[in-house]
Amino acid sequence: DVKPYTDESVAMGDFLSKKCHVIAATDLRTRQYNKFAGTISALGALPSYDEVHTVLKTLSRNKAAKYLDGDKFSIIGIFPIGAGYLFTNDRKMNTVEALAGKRIATLNYQKDAIHMVNYVNSTVVPSDITNFGGKFNNGSVDICYSPAFAFSAYELYHGLGENGGIIRYQLAQLTMQLLTNTDSFDAKTRQASRNIMFSMFDKALNIVKKHE
């Protein structure tokens, strides 16, 4: 059975309580359970979708299983959900220096993003994937970052208004990952799942590019 959630943290809580065998969540949420796979979305790590394809293809191979299968948790599938872009309420903001003093909706569990925001002297506004869009749209923050699909899904055009814009620079490559308790499936099944997920890469990326 598949159970949809609107709050990723609630879904993770149910998974950790073993109310389900597998959770599909953003790598930002799953990285604490598999740090190796979590590095895919590190800021600036992968500059284009070609590199994402290469990395995910490599991780889908049998030899990579030792990096994805942990004693307690395993990643049994990864697919792209798009590069993260900056959405700003001021399209004139086109330099790093211009970010100083700006309020940025920042996921409170993404340490590299918090570091980046502090580094450019912006203000961290703790957020999560359920409320960052609302904060941007109501003016509580000046900037948020997300894959392109958020423009429609979170109605970010409200926050952009007439003066805003989307900075055409891929900050990071975000993915959805399937996380399971290692003892829920044998090694053969876990690997088969990874192979199936990678076989859907092109289909997933086509959806991403349509939104972009």
Model regions: which residues?
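Short helix-initiation/N-cap motifs at beta->coil->alpha
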Residues: V2-G13, N108-K111, T123-N138
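Internal catalytic or translocation cores that form aromatic/hydrophobic pockets or channels
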Residues: P4, E8-S17, I23-T30
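Contiguous mixed-secondary-structure segments that line small-molecule binding/active-site clefts
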Residues: G13, T26-Y119, L156-G159, Q170-E212
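Alpha-to-beta junction loops
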Residues: F15-A25, R103, S122-T123, N137-P147
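A ligand-binding cleft/hinge motif common to bilobed small-molecule-binding domains
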Residues: D27-F36, G133-N138, I143-R168
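Histidine- and/or cysteine-centered catalytic micro-motif in compact active-site loops
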Residues: Y109, I129-T130, P147-A150, N181-D183
